[in-house]
A protein has these predicted regions:
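Exported/extracytosolic protein signature
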Residues: 1-291
Length: 291
């Protein structure tokens, strides 16, 4: 989002004294124009817990003189919590700042991680531009639930400015399933003709459920191959050809589209610290067979 240039006015009355005669002259009007424009964008439009967001701040000097020694301050998405606390949902990624002046990479300015994050000095030549690229990580104070967002404001200040310039970028919480899967075997030691179980745990850390219409599938090759399969999903028996297929010749096991569904994660925010906790939605697939 771009900050429009500040426009202000001043007036200067004139006085003339001639041999003890006081004359009021006309009043001259002048206009103060802010020659700095600022915009800020987020490369990634969405985030999940722990994600890194890349920000690009573009500053343009439309004046005829350089703007020297500017300070760029990023509020890292600060918001009020409770009666007096301020929380920061972003953590600056150390060493990520790059400064370009008219497209040329510059030595890294002084960076204070904060919060808030400050970058100084930034000098923009007359008619030129400066581009700052840096990263921040969504931390435990970033709302991961559906409808969550981080509103991030950058402020540019300095003696050469008629007023501070600001620009804003907003990223929203990802509203998709975030799946992880683990596999275990029981018992761990078996002999021929023993029964063995493979347990698959599906975890959904996302703010949206995995629906049957998403047509997610699991495939696995059992080696050694199994026979006389029995399959359950969340404790309910599955039927071969309806929820899964199994090739006894190759050991290939495949769930069929529409068979898998996993609840969305549950999100809670501590009333004491303001930190968010994610409890993943879970589903359990158990495949049992004879070696």
């Amino acid at each position: 989002m771009q900050q429009e240039g500040f426009r202000g006015y001043f007036l200067q009355p004139g006085h003339l004294d001639l041999q003890r005669q006081h004359h009021q002259l006309n009043i001259a009007y002048g206009e103060l124009l802010d020659v700095l424009t600022a915009s800020k964008t987020a490369v990634e439009g969405t985030y999940t817990a722990g994600d890194t967001v890349t920000y690009v701040v573009t500053l343009r000097n439309t004046g005829t003189a350089p703007l020297a020694g500017l300070t760029v301050t990023d509020d890292l998405g600060s918001y009020a919590f409770g009666t007096s606390a301020t929380l920061y949902p972003l953590t600056y990624v150390s060493g990520s700042v790059n400064l370009f002046i008219n497209g040329v990479l510059q030595p890294t300015p002084t960076v204070t991680a904060g919060p808030p994050l400050t970058i100084t000095p930034v000098t923009i030549p007359a008619g030129g531009d400066a581009v700052l690229v840096y990263q921040a990580q969504a931390n435990e104070f970033a709302d991961p639930s559906q409808g969550g967002s981080i509103i991030n404001v950058v402020t540019i200040s300095g003696d050469g400015l008629a007023a501070d310039a600001t620009a804003t970028a907003t990223v929203t919480a990802d509203a998709e399933p975030q799946l992880a899967i683990s596999k275990s075997i029981s018992p761990s030691q078996v002999t021929d003709n023993d029964r063995i179980s493979y347990t698959f745990i599906l975890q959904n850390s996302g703010s949206a459920a995995l629906e049957a219409t998403d047509n997610a599938i699991i495939t696995d090759v059992f080696d050694p191959r199994l026979s006389a399969l029995s399959v359950t999903y969340n404790g309910a028996a599955w039927t071969e050809g309806v929820q899964y297929t199994y090739d006894t010749a190759t050991g290939l096991f495949t769930t069929l589209p529409g068979a898998l569904a996993v609840d969305a994660a549950t999100v809670t925010q501590s009333v004491t610290t303001g930190a968010y906790t994610i409890t993943p939605g879970l589903a359990t697939l158990v495949v049992t067979g004879t070696i």
